[in-house]
Amino acid sequence: MTQYDPTNSRPVIALMTDFGIGDGDVGVMKGVIASITPDVHIIDITHHVAPQNVPSGAWILASAYRYFPKNTVYVCVVDPGVGSSRRAIALHAGDWFFVGPDNGLFSYILAEQPVRATVLLSNPTYHLPHVSSTFHGRDIFAPVGAHLARGLTRTFAELGTSIDPATLQRLEIALTSRRGTDIDAHIVHVDNFGNLITSIPSDMVPELFTAPQVQIIFPQQGVVVEKRRRFFAEGHEDGQAFIYSDSSGYIGIAVRNGNAARTLGVGVGAAITLVTAAK
């Protein structure tokens, strides 16, 4: 039997945008990529990030990137600042490469992976000949991603000027901070079911289901959630919110057979405090 040889595998580009699929923008980006690197395997993470919602896009990327092969190139476009002074960047972090705007979209990557190199995409050789002020996904990010998938580390240094990763934009919403046993964080994503995803990694609270009492408090809304469930079917009280560990690896809040965002009246950006205490 022929054994799989990962060194002979096709290059992989993963796309994530807020473009939707009603227009031709996603198809055009794929066409640009295929024109440069015809053998590339293009995988869509999603094209339905809420429009201009950088925090949601950052979280979706964070929940997905670990499940792709090493050396995958992520081309990510949630870019409300396109055409402005915001920087176009590529970074080599962990075992993967990321291409997109410097607007906080890579906040979780920067927090979770060692950054090996970062470049400003200043070399026009790797762009399309004519760069629009409104479609950098087509004119800069797609061609850069395609060239990068062909050459990876060899090409990376040629993409532009090296920049200090400490200068990259990071979303405050993606940060967590401890105060004793309390954790201050935010809601960073609302999924299709209305579940509220927090910026707190589940492994940050190993006692989530063993501590005598755990609460998530929304101080601005005066809302407290303290029921905990290991899985959705265990949440037998329809209409009541409970805390759970989401499959993405982050702590979430759900309502069985309901919508937590609507039930609690909160959404992306809401401040929370997770409190662990003995009764």
Go through the PLM ranges and name each one.
Residues 249-279:
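Generic C-terminus detector
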Residues 2-6, 10-51:
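N-terminal glycine-rich anion-binding loop in soluble enzyme alpha/beta folds
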Residues 11-12, 36-42, 53-59, 69-78, ...:
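Active-site histidine-anchored catalytic micro-motif
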Residues 199-248:
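A C-terminal functional module that forms or caps the active site or interfaces directly
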Residues 71, 211-213, 239-240, 267-271:
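Loop/turn positions that initiate beta-strands
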Residues 19-23, 81-83, 193-195, 258-260:
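Short acidic, Gly/Ser-rich segments with clustered Asp/Glu that frequently serve as metal-coordination loops
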Residues 128-209:
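Anionic-ligand-binding alpha/beta catalytic cores of soluble enzymes and soluble regulatory domains
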